[in-house]
């Protein structure tokens, strides 16, 4: 999408800065991201996005240039654990399943159909279940998830711009092996330790980076 923010859109971002509301750029287009970065006077967050380096073309993740710009802004990218955010294989699985669902629904006359019609939800759930039985889901691993943290740190040269954005409540049964729920956080911490992160680094990743951004946003409010 190459459109520009309306005057009202620019005003909204500026007003969020003014009153101390975080601007979250997960779920926006690349174009919208750069417009936000040109407007905001305080750091922003990507609350549940990962590194597009590992999932080329997947716009819910951030590419290297975006991550670098986010770091310049002082913001943070909070890594999403959903397997489709972590590996290309899982991401392509979703695309192939959607294509199969569309083909399954397509009427013989070729008329357009709304694949996401709420009335078809039960049918879609049943289709997805059968599809998974025939095509087992390629769950990501803890190690592959940790690669995203490493990538951000190496790209920005600092541990200050990455955090945890699990999306435990949003990605359903697609979570990585070893990171299925919050009880798995010791696995994440141990994995970071095994990769050479210090206790102070890990504290930043687990929450201090977000609190730092939060503080800067509050301090920037009028």
Give names to the regions the model predicted.
Residues 79-84, 156-179:
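Short acidic/histidine-rich active-site segments
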Residues 64-126:
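Aromatic-lined glycan-binding groove of carbohydrate-active enzymes
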Residues 28-34, 51-54, 84-87, 170-172:
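Active-site environment of divalent metal-dependent phosphoester hydrolases
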Residues 1-4, 22, 52-57, 132-140:
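The substrate-binding groove and active-site-proximal loops of carbohydrate-active enzymes
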Residues 123-151, 199-214:
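C-terminal helical cap
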Residues 1-24, 28-45, 59-75, 144-160:
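Histidine/acidic residue-rich metal-binding segments in metalloenzymes
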Residues 23-25, 48, 77, 167, ...:
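Conserved, mostly hydrophobic/aromatic
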Residues 180-222:
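Mid-to-C-terminal alpha-helical segments outside catalytic/metal-binding sites
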